[in-house]
Regions:
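Flexible, glycine-rich terminal cap/loop adjacent to redox cofactors
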Residues: 1-88
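Short, glycine/acidic-enriched loop or turn micro-motifs at the edges of active sites
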Residues: 23, 112, 131
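Generic hydrophobic alpha-helical segments
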Residues: 44-45, 98, 145
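A short, well-structured juxtamembrane/interface segment
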Residues: 90-101
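Short loop/helix-cap segments at secondary-structure boundaries that form the rim of catalytic
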Residues: 101, 116-123, 137-139, 164
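Short hydrophobic beta-strand that contains or immediately precedes a catalytic carboxylate
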Residues: 106-111
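Short acidic-hydrophobic, aromatic-tinged amphipathic segments that line or gate anion-handling sites
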Residues: 127-128
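Catalytic cysteine-centered active loop of the rhodanese-like fold, especially the PTP/DSP P-loop
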Residues: 133-169
Length: 169
């Protein structure tokens, strides 16, 4: 968000970073949003100019005040996500890869029921992340499981719940 999420007027900001999967070198970035986009793209540009990596993004310091930024800036968060991918703490797939998944893949939408009712990806069942632990015994551990949410945080949390409960795929 352009400022702390609890602060009035907070609006979403989406950051896409491109990085070398071998060493994490930051190669490019795009940001979509409103307030503060210029500040964030300049932060990313400075890291790219000096040949920095996604690990540098996690360490960036910035001025913090709730009306203008969150304690962990969106640029820091992009670095954390990339670091999790590089270190194998999370696995991701792209939307275009969904059609290539085995037919018996378990597809779970971990958004709330109200969000799911507004629209969902065909073939995804709705198990809200807050209820996932209650349904673990219903999920086969020998099948590939793909989770989806609106932004990424709940998908990551669902992934971690599954991994911590012995799901390998």
């Amino acid at each position: 968000a352009s400022n702390a999420g609890y602060y009035p007027g907070a609006v979403p900001m989406s950051i896409k970073i491109l990085f070398d999967p071998e060493n994490g070198k930051l190669l490019g970035a795009q940001i979509v949003g409103f307030n503060g986009v210029d500040k964030r793209i300049e932060m990313l540009e400075q890291v790219i100019q000096r040949g920095g990596t996604v690990y540098d993004l996690t360490e960036l310091e910035h001025a913090y005040a709730p009306p203008y930024s969150s304690a962990k800036d969106p640029v820091n968060m992009a670095g954390f996500v990339a670091e999790n991918i590089l270190k194998g703490k999370s696995k991701i797939i792209q939307w275009r890869e969904l059609a290539e998944l085995p037919a018996d893949t378990i597809r779970i939408d971990v958004r709330t029921r109200d969000e799911h009712k507004l629209g969902s990806i065909p073939g995804f069942i709705n198990i809200p992340v807050d209820e996932l632990r209650e349904h673990l015994d219903e999920l086969p551990k020998d099948k590939l499981i793909v989770v989806s949410c609106a932004v990424g945080l709940r998908g990551y949390l669902a992934y971690r719940i599954l991994v911590q409960n012995g799901f390998k795929n």
